[in-house]
Amino acid sequence: MYDIVFLAGGWGAAYDLGFSDTLAAGISKAYYSGSIIGAICHGPLGLINSKDKNGNILIAGRKMTGVTDKQVKELNITMTPLHPEEELKKAGALFEAKTKFLDQFAYHVVVDDEKRFVTGQNQNSGHETAQRIMKIIAESS
């Protein structure tokens, strides 16, 4: 297994990550194998269908972030089938975000309490998301 599984975002992720049963099963397997799971932008959509050992949604009750509904509207990409803020909330995640004049200029990184999921709000969060993941890896070694 891997130390880290990372889901990059981008608008294309809205068309496939949240619909893939194979990815959902892989995320669950990675989680139970001890991997740290990171995602930015639309990448967290790949987490919404992963299940725990009891069949419950794995991310329910966990702090997470991703692209905001406000940013989806600002970028005029409402035609995409899945929107991270909306879908993470539906999955029971505790959604957090920062806002600015335009959300595409904001950035925010969230680490869940267990330090197993590290999510970044948008493309501006990539560097800090990676740094946080590497810090968790270093502290656990």
Language-model segments: residues:
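Active-site-adjacent pocket-lining segments in enzyme domains
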Residues: 1-141
